Amino acid sequence: MLSKLNKKIERVFKEEPKEVNCKEYVDHMDIHQPFVCVGYKMDACKTKAEAFEKDFAVNMWLDSIMGPLNPKFQEWLDQRIFTQFVGAEADFTLDHSYILFYAQTVNPNAFIELVNELVQNKSISDEDYQSLHAQAIANNLRGLDHFDGLANDLLRSHFEEYDYIENLNSIQNMKIEQVHAYIKDLDFSHSCVTKILPNDSI
């Protein structure tokens, strides 16, 4: 159907604001232990290449600070700052970006304080980089042997207009200096804390 406006019709998206919509949200559910999530709103990326590389670099850093690679991880478990349900993840795209730290914990405030301390350490050790980088390359190579997954990845890259093989190469060629550059660029000033607490009846 032709447009009566005689003009090209385009989808218009409002620019994502830098500020979070709400700094704290608390809800109650039928659970036995609280859940907490500390989210940080990040600037959207300017190019697809930047989004892919930054996503990989930041998630590598998160694996090094919020996981068994961190020597203090077992100590935090013993102190019950969090349970086995704990993690961190990041997503960087052209229209939005964020970093999340989440956990099940009997002491949400202690977890929040821990996260606030962790994000001040914007670095990754050479040992952690070597380990996580080698693991990522190995996972990519194994992925090339799973043809169903490979077909889906190639199809997705076609529709999202990026080069799948080029992205794999960018991971293989990424140096620790690039990882540090992306980490140092992070701005943690826009945060939101979400708490899911047990109902009084539990």
Give the label of every model feature segment:
Residues 1, 111-116, 182-185:
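Active-site-proximal alpha-helical segments within enzyme catalytic domains
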Residues 1-45, 199-202:
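An aromatic/glycine/proline-enriched structural segment found at the starts
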Residues 1-9, 117-126:
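A common structural junction motif
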Residues 5-6, 57, 61, 101, ...:
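Hydrophobic alpha-helical transmembrane segments of multi-pass membrane proteins
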Residues 25, 87-89, 180-183:
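Generic recognition of flexible, low-complexity loop/linker segments
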Residues 31-37, 43-69:
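A conserved active-site cap/scaffold subdomain adjacent to cofactor or substrate pockets
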Residues 35-45, 51, 73-122, 128-174, ...:
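M16 family metallopeptidases and their MPP-like homologs
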Residues 180-182, 186-192:
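Bilobed periplasmic-binding protein-like "clamshell/Venus-flytrap" ligand-binding domains
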